[in-house]
Each structure stands twice: as C-alpha cells, then as structure tokens.
Swiss-Prot record:
PANTHER family: BIFUNCTIONAL PROTEIN GLMU, NUCLEOTIDYL TRANSFERASE. This is Bifunctional protein GlmU. Residues 1-225 are annotated as: Pyrophosphorylase. Keywords: Acyltransferase, Cell shape, Cell wall biogenesis/degradation, Cytoplasm, Magnesium, Metal-binding, Multifunctional enzyme, Nucleotidyltransferase, Peptidoglycan synthesis, Repeat, Transferase. The gene is glmU. Catalyzes the last two sequential reactions in the de novo biosynthetic pathway for UDP-N-acetylglucosamine (UDP-GlcNAc). The C-terminal domain catalyzes the transfer of acetyl group from acetyl coenzyme A to glucosamine-1-phosphate (GlcN-1-P) to produce N-acetylglucosamine-1-phosphate (GlcNAc-1-P), which is converted into UDP-GlcNAc by the transfer of uridine 5-monophosphate (from uridine 5-triphosphate), a reaction catalyzed by the N-terminal domain. It comes from Francisella philomiragia subsp. philomiragia (strain ATCC 25017 / CCUG 19701 / FSC 153 / O#319-036). Residues 226-246 are annotated as: Linker. Acetyl-CoA binds at A376, N382, Y383, S401, A419, R436.
C-alpha cells in the first residue's frame, strides 16, 4: 500500500515568546520539524505533506532541501481542520498523521503504527504519570477504545485516566474522506478536533488498533522553552546511556551534548561538557577531555584530545595528541603519534607521523613531514591579502621558535630554521637557515634619566 505522511506545523507557539514558529526551535542542534522528517524518511513514504500556517515562509525555507509538499492552513481552526487542508493533495492508500513539535518519535514505533493500521485506524497512545493537558483515551466496558476526550472537555473522573492520546494516527485515506468533512466544533475550544475521528470510526464499526511508544520522551511535545530544555536533557541522557552500553565511560551523563551522529569504539572516556556536532567517529581507547567540541571528524584509536580543544572537519590518526586549548580546523590530517599542543591552531594542514607542534603556533595550508619539530610561536604566513599559499616542510625538519614561514615556501628534509627567522625563500635539505639582525653589545650606552 502507498503511504502519505502529514506533518502538522501550522501553530504559532506563542508560549515560546519567539520570532520564529515553534517547529523551528532547535533540539540537539536541529529544528523540531527536521527531527520529525529524519524519523519519517526511513519509512520511504510516497508523499510527505507539511501543513504550515504561522510564518510559513520560514518553515518552507528551513525545509527547502527536502522533498515535501507544503499546504497552508490559513486559519488556525484545529487539528482536524489542518488535516482537511491536506486531503486534496493525498492520493495514497494510507495516511500517517504526525506533529511537527513532537520531535523524538522513533522510526520503529512509526513503522509499527503503520503496520497495525491495516485498512482501518491505528492510534498511538501512552500511559503516563502526569496526563495534565492531554487528551484521554476513553474505553468501553470491554476495554475497546470508544473515543478521545480533550482535557478541557473532560469530566473530573475522565481526568483521572492515565492513558493519553499522542495525536499520532495511521488511517486509510478513504476513511478520512468520509470523516473529516463531517467534523464538528462543539467543544470548549471551538475547534475541529482530529481526535473525533476515533468516535467516528467506532460509529462506523471500523477496527481501532492501539500501539504504544517504547520511551515516554518519544511522544513528548514542546510548547515552551522549559519543555524544550527538559526534552533536550531527556534525549541527551538517552544518548549517554546508549554509548555507555557500547563500552564508553561518560564522566557525567547529564553533561554531554550530542547534536548529531556519534559512532563509538570501546573503552573510550568522555569527560564533562563534551559537545558533538555533525557526524563524529571515535575509535577504541579514545580520551576526550573536558569542554571539548568535536564536529564532523574522525578520531582513531588511542588518541587523546585534551581539555578545551576543538576538532572540526578533520581526522586525528592513531595515538596522536591534541590540546589542551588546541583548535584543529577543517581539512587537517594529524598523522599517527603527532602532537598539536596547547594554543596551536591548524587549518588545512597535514602534520606528519611523530611530528610535534607543541605550543603557540599557527599552521595553515601546510604539509609537514614526519618527525618534525615545530617550535613555539611559529607562524606559517599563508595569506597575502587575496590568496592562500602553501608551506611544505620535509621529514625531520626543525623549525626554531618565533619563526615566520612566508608562503609559498618549501623547507627541505632535515633542514633547521634558526629561532626568530623570517623565511621568504626555499631552504634546501639539511641546511641551516637563519634570518635575523646581528646582535650588538653597546657598552657605552646609558639609560635615560628623568628630568
């Protein structure tokens, strides 16, 4: 059977007190609506419809790279009315209905909901400790679902019910064609509730199947920044537990932030306040110090990233050491056993096997061979104000402290650069190059005297 997915994303989210629509608030570094799409796309639906409303242009811009159809709900008249706007654009047999502000529903739970629907109606419900504000599932004396009542319309007795409606359904398109045009708005909100299709299904003797999420956070919606922060911590705790189960030690599971995809080896150690962005791969026995940021990088076995360091878009090879207070910018390849030390910045640089830049250095657009020593304060001067230029350093070279290498320049293997030199031309292999003013001693000099 063909499948359409309808994602409701028209709400204002006034409690966010924001200039952005609610679905564009971010969780783990990604907008809420993109979280929902990332969980839907593996289902390979034939059609994805996003119902927009408040600041629709911003939502459309955020999803410009996605293959979706946008449908506008011009008036906010309820969830049933929102799905009704999408109905003319649905040609598929089944319809999965989701919410753009419920970001963490898992693909597996959705797949089970779709499977359970068969040709009829499947409802995702959950039993929660605190159902306040949520629609309650009303069952008959035989335990079958009869209808859903919203909190504002519920009696005191119904408000004691712990089973709640998540708002997620999978239903045959033919049933929506029958039910949605007949929704009423005689309720406390004066809105057209999508929840009323459950009672309609019951009235038409349509089978109603109930499925449940695995984790409660999967069905948690976001209405304000407090809930957003709480859900962020719930999700980060879940991620921490997952990576710990794979053999990673986390110093404090409440102080880790994974804002992308993290692949881990065994026996790694993550200290407090580590932030992961994009796609990060960690090998075995990797140590990440406190307050580090890793983004779109590969960290191989036995690497140490010391405290307060950043690695972005680069690869750190086996046994290398980075930091503390180091910054590895995109397109770097730090080879096996190499060292990027404290207050060293590297950009688009290959640092060869066993080479060391231990302190206070800038390496940009550089290719450095094996077993080199880069002294403190060395600068590769790669930018002429318009273009970037390359510095090449051969194996076993020694670059003395406080030297400037004016690119483009080649330093031969085994060459030595005297401390404090400014190198403007190529240095042959095994040569000493020194470029600095001759030291003078003036024994007749006297300090000035204050008058």
């Amino acid at each position: 059977m063909s499948l359409a997915v309808v994602i409701l994303a028209a709400g204002k989210g006034s409690r966010m007190n924001s200039n952005k629509p609610k679905v564009l608030q971010t969780l783990t570094g990604k907008t809420l609506i993109r979280h929902v799409l990332s969980r839907v796309e593996p289902l390979n639906p034939d059609n994805i419809i996003v119902v927009t409303g408040h600041l629709k242009e911003m939502v459309e811009a955020d999803l410009a790279d996605k293959k979706v159809t946008f449908v506008e709900q011009k008036e906010q008249l309820g969830t049933g009315h929102a799905v009704l706007q999408a109905l003319p654009y649905i040609k598929e047999d089944k319809v999965l209905i989701l919410y753009g502000d419920v970001p963490l529903i898992s693909t597996d739970v959705l797949a089970n909901l779709i499977k359970s629907a068969s040709d009829d109606l499947a409802v995702l419900t959950a039993i929660v400790d605190n159902p306040t504000g949520l629609g309650r599932i009303i069952r008959d004396k035989f335990g079958a679902v009869s209808h859903i009542v919203e909190e504002k319309d519920a009696t005191d007795g119904q408000r004691q019910i712990k089973e709640i409606n998540t708002g997620m359904y999978c239903v045959a398109k033919s049933h929506l064609d029958d039910w949605l045009p007949n929704l009423g708005n005689t309720n406390a909100q004066g809105e057209y509730y999508l929840t009323d299709i459950v009672a309609m299904a019951r009235g038409d003797n349509i089978s109603i199947t109930v499925t449940h999420p695995v984790e409660e956070f999967e069905i948690q919606g976001v209405n304000d920044r407090i809930q957003l922060a709480q859900l962020e911590r719930e999700w980060q705790k879940h991620i921490a537990e997952v990576i710990m189960s794979k053999g990673v030690s986390v110093a404090d599971p409440s102080r880790i932030d994974v804002r992308g995809k993290l692949e881990v080896g065994k026996d790694c150690w993550l200290d407090i306040n580590v932030i992961i962005k994009g796609h990060v791969k960690l090998g075995n026995n990797v140590v990440i110090g406190a307050n580090c940021i890793l983004k779109n990088c590969t960290i191989e076995d036995n690497v140490k990233i010391k405290a307060n360091s950043m690695v972005d878009g680069s690869i750190i090879r086996e046994g290398a050491i980075v930091g503390p207070f180091a910054r590895v910018r995109p397109e770097c390849d730090v080879k096996e056993g190499a060292v990027i030390g404290n207050f060293v910045e590297a950009k688009k640089t290959i640092l060869g096997r066993g080479s060391k830049a231990s302190h206070l250095t800038y390496l940009g657009d550089s290719e450095i061979g094996a077993n080199c020593n880069i002294g403190a304060g060395v600068i590769t001067c790669n930018y002429d104000g318009v273009n970037k230029h390359k510095t090449t350093i051969g194996d076993y070279a020694f670059i003395g402290s406080d030297s400037q290498l004016i690119a483009p320049v080649n330093i031969g293997s085994g060459a030595t650069i005297g401390a404090g030199s400014t190198i403007v031309s190529d240095v042959p292999a095994d040569n000493l190059a020194i470029s600095r003013a001759r030291q003078r001693h003036i024994d007749t000099w006297q300090r000035p005297v204050k008058k």
